[in-house]
Amino acid sequence: MDAARRGDTQPVMWTTGWLLLLPLLLCEGAQALECYSCVQKADDGCSPHRMKTVKCGPGVDVCTEAVGAVETIHGQFSVAVRGCGSGIPGKNDRGLDLHGLLAFFQLQQCSEDRCNAKLNLTLRGLNPAGNESAYEPNGAECYSCVGLSREKCQGSMPPVVNCYNASGRVYKGCFDGNVTLTAANVTVSLPVRGCVQDETCTRDGVTGPGFTLSGSCCQGPRCNADLRNKTYFSPRIPPLVLLPPPTTAAPSTRAQNSSSTTSTAAPTTTTSIIKPTTAQASHTSPHEMDLEVIQEEGASLSGGAAGHGGTAGHGGAAGHQDRSNMEKYPGKGGAQIPAKGGSGTLGSWLSAVLLTVVAGAML
């Protein structure tokens, strides 16, 4: 019985819960912020009959409208965006100047439904373009893109205008760039061409909150056909010149290297020549000394033999004098052996000396 009652009460509880949550969900959907939404590219894209109403997503508390206007000496145009924004309510106005190109930017955010239609997107706070017929051309010619689409502002398709000086400014340069506006998660961009003051600016620009005006300048008739991928140098700065590689410095370097190599190699060559010479001298000196000893020994022995075999008196005295001198002053080969024996002793001694010399020569 209790189980049956529980089974009956469970669907009732689910139904009651959904009935309580449904008003809350409907109330939250009804409280979603509503904003106007449109995009204007130098046209009437944000005119009243072309604007739409959108409901913003969760967490979006403000509606946004932003407009950026650009003025050249030949005209002006504007880009604008309306939609659901982000941030806090408020207003921001800013005026910009890029080498004689004037720009005006306005941003407004509000937190009420359909509150983002307060800015005038057609009448801007810019100085009206001057009467071209009242000014005398200064000789410069440029392509002009004022509110033209990107398809109509390519290469030499835009109209050509004559530059003139206005408001005390000299306009003799040509400009090629873009204006970009980002607001309400939408980005709008249009090309900008015309006459400017600077003739040599390179990728210069001015910015505001979500707004950018940037481009490059050049000098010469109709030089602003396409400056996106080109770089122009100021005439006051000398251009970069690539010098050819040196051709005369290399041989002199080789000559210096060869001379230094020769000078360092000379001592090594001399040393290698001197060392064998020293070794040869030390190697051959024993043989020369042996020959000198043999010659001196032979001369001494011949003198002694003459003393014994000669007449009495002078021959014997000469023989004794030679032997005494040999004992006092030994020869170069070492101590001399006095000859005391006869011819047999002399022969055996000479044989021993000859055998020693032959053995040394063979070794």
From Swiss-Prot:
- Gene3D superfamilies per record: CD59
Residue ranges with Gly residues bias: 304-318
- Domain of life, per UniProt, equals Eukaryota
Any single GO CC term annotated in Swiss-Prot or TrEMBL for this entry? plasma membrane
Q: Which parts of this chain are annotated as the region Disordered?
A: 238-287, 301-336
Q: Which residues form a coiled coil?
A: none
Biased composition, class Pro residues, residue ranges:
238-248
Positions of the propeptide removed during maturation: 344-363
Conditions for induction: Up-regulated in suprabasal keratinocytes of hyperplastic skin induced by phorbol-ester.
* Topology relative to the membrane: Lipid-anchor; GPI-anchor
Q: Which UniProt keywords apply?
A: Cell membrane, Glycoprotein, GPI-anchor, Lipoprotein, Membrane, Repeat, Signal
Report the leader peptide range.
1-32
Q: Does the keyword Cell membrane apply?
A: yes
**Biased composition annotated in UniProt, kind: Low complexity:** 249-278
Q: What are the GO MF terms of this UniProt record?
A: laminin binding
List, in alphabetical order, the GO biological process terms annotated in this UniProt record. cell motility; cell-matrix adhesion; negative regulation of smooth muscle cell apoptotic process
Residues glycosylated per entry: N120, N131, N178, N185
Q: Where in the cell is it found?
A: Cell membrane
Q: Describe the location of the UPAR/Ly6 domain by residue ranges.
A: 35-128, 142-224
Basic and acidic residues biased stretches: 320-330
Please name the Pfam families in this protein's record: UPAR_LY6 (PF00021)
GPI-anchor amidated serine: lipidated positions: S343
Q: What binding partners and quaternary form does the record give? A: Binds laminin-1 and laminin-5. Interacts with LGALS3. Interacts with AGR2 and AGR3.
Q: What does this protein do?
A: Supports cell migration. May be involved in tumor progression.
The protein's name = Ly6/PLAUR domain-containing protein 3
Q: Which organism is it from?
A: Mus musculus
What is the organism lineage in this UniProt record?
Answer: Eukaryota, Metazoa, Chordata, Craniata, Vertebrata
